[in-house]
Amino acid sequence: IKAMNMLQSQSITSTSTISQWAAVEALNGDQSHIASNNEVFKERRDLVVSMLNQANGLTCNTPIGAFYVYPSCAGVIGKKTPDGKVIENDEDFVIYLLETEGVAAVHGEAFGLSPFFRISYALSTEVLEDACQRIQRACAALT
């Protein structure tokens, strides 16, 4: 049993040899794609930040790293949805976005960052533009 426990422990808690060699190649191999990918993500980031800052009640700072933004929805807290529900917090806001516009976001409280919410920009420019337009429309409908 002791030997089986050791084998099982090593099998599930350690990185496999093939994964280790793949990581070595990824780190030491051709890096030419990184600059072009960085540029694409900067363009997507800038698009999302700009469009979210145009939405009523939202403010979005430009992140330095990662592939997501954390806009503040403090400006929509206390507002009413078209069906009369009051947005009381960031969780209410992301539920409202999902239910009315089909846009999925994560409420900031899940990360200890209320009243913010998290949006990934690791999607195509077309999808991001559409999602941001939907968010703008949802914010404009609040009173």
PLM features per residue range, with description:
Residues 1-143:
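PLP-dependent class I/II
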